């Protein structure tokens, strides 16, 4: 009877943010009639790479804020590269998407393990941790990011030519 509190809502929203953001990307993939099993592995690679950028493990970073920006942007670029590789495999060799992404699903977790030497990434960078524990207007920062991603994806799917093409391809690839 005491579970309907703002604290419970806040905790639940915070816990689903990552899943919702990844789910938005998967929605776009599924809307095209495809499937991507490598999402979790790409999250592992990005999660392993991010602290390496802002802690200066890969190369010295003169400013913590530049390091944080690199720690956000470069893992997205790296994950996008792997996604493009999957797309290239599927288109160039006519491999079924489930098979191509299964390969990266398996290899990606290995890449993440090797890049961290199997160690847990532990870091104390308060400026970066603000993304996880910070609040804006009393709402966790992660929730704001999730809401923005959902709104942008909904707008793209409903109001842009690209979004309509994504939905059209999923309905009939030859159309």
Task: Indicate where each model-derived feature is located.
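Membrane-interfacial amphipathic/re-entrant helices at transmembrane-helix boundaries
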Residues: 1-23, 58-70
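Transmembrane helix-bundle core of multi-pass membrane transporters
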Residues: 2, 93, 97-160
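Short, non-helical or kinked segments that cap or interrupt transmembrane helices
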Residues: 6-9, 28-49, 89-102
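Hydrophobic alpha-helical transmembrane segments
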Residues: 12, 20, 41-45, 69-77, ...
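Hydrophobic positions within alpha-helical transmembrane segments of bacterial inner-membrane proteins
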Residues: 20, 24, 28, 41, ...
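Membrane-embedded helix boundary and interhelical linker motif in transport proteins
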Residues: 31-84
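Membrane-helix/interface signature in polytopic inner-membrane proteins
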Residues: 152-175
């Amino acid at each position: 009877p005491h579970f309907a509190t703002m604290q419970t809502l806040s905790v639940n929203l915070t816990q689903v943010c990552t899943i919702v953001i990844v789910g938005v990307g998967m929605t776009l993939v599924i809307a095209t009639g495809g499937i991507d099993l490598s999402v979790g592995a790409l999250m592992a690679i990005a999660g392993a790479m991010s602290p390496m950028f802002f802690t200066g493990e890969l190369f010295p970073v003169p400013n913590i804020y530049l390091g944080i920006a690199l720690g956000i942007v470069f893992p997205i670029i790296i994950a996008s590269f792997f996604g493009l590789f999957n797309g290239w495999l599927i288109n160039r060799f006519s491999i079924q998407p489930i098979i191509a992404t299964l390969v990266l699903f398996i290899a990606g977790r290995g890449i993440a393990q090797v890049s961290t030497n199997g160690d847990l990434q532990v870091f104390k960078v308060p400026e970066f941790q603000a993304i996880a524990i910070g609040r804006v207007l009393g709402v966790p920062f992660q929730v704001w990011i999730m809401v923005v991603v959902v709104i942008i994806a909904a707008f793209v799917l409903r109001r842009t030519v690209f979004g309509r093409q994504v939905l059209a391809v999923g309905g009939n690839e030859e159309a």
